[in-house]
Amino acid sequence: MKIIGVTGGVGSGKTELLHYIEKNYRCRILLADEASHKVMQKGGRIYEPLVALLGSSVLDSSGEINRKEMAARIFSHEELLGRVNALIHPAVREFILEAVAEEREKAAVGADDAVDYFFLEAALLIECGYRSVVDEMWYIYCDLAVRRERLKKSRGYSDEKIDSILSSQLTEAQFRSGSDVVIDNSGNLEDAYRQIREALASGERK
């Protein structure tokens, strides 16, 4: 089983490409955002510490943590943001490592539901030190003008919001230097799909 990290800037089209991979390969796909949901939900490993830190005002009517309310609570509060991240990031990493170990065990014993690939997607894979977790890091590149157009059309983002998000992410050069494979998703999807097929076929030959 091969573990592949998938990263890239906002609006690069990672989700669409992962849908293609999921349909065409024996794989498991884990989104870091989904992992953060799991560890924060009621009964999750950091639910109680987060509520203790932020207070019950961040809970919704069912007792779950309202992520929008939490974001508003820590917005422009650097110290509190740091304390929240100090809880979330290690818990997410632990969740991911457990998922990887689970799939490795299935592959080792030849389980019926064993997979050939484990794809881990997150915008912060490189910054958060996941190079040591994955066998290969993929950077989904997309021309900035195309990304802006996608974000405006699909999410209704303003230029100001897009600029704010971009300023907090790695530069293209940093993404490229931290990755083994670059998939150019600036053009049509069929071309990106072809690059994916070639990258996986090349990996199998190594």
Language model features: what each stretch is:
Residues 6:
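Hydrophobic anchor at the beta1->P-loop junction of P-loop NTPases
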Residues 9:
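P-loop (Walker A) phosphate-binding loop of NTP-binding proteins
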Residues 12:
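ATP-binding Walker
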Residues 15:
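Walker A/P-loop
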Residues 27-40:
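Short beta-strand-centered segment that lines the nucleotide-binding/catalytic pocket of NTP-utilizing
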Residues 37-114:
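ATP-dependent small-molecule kinase phosphotransfer cores
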Residues 98-117, 131-140, 144-157, 167, ...:
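NTP-dependent small-molecule kinase module
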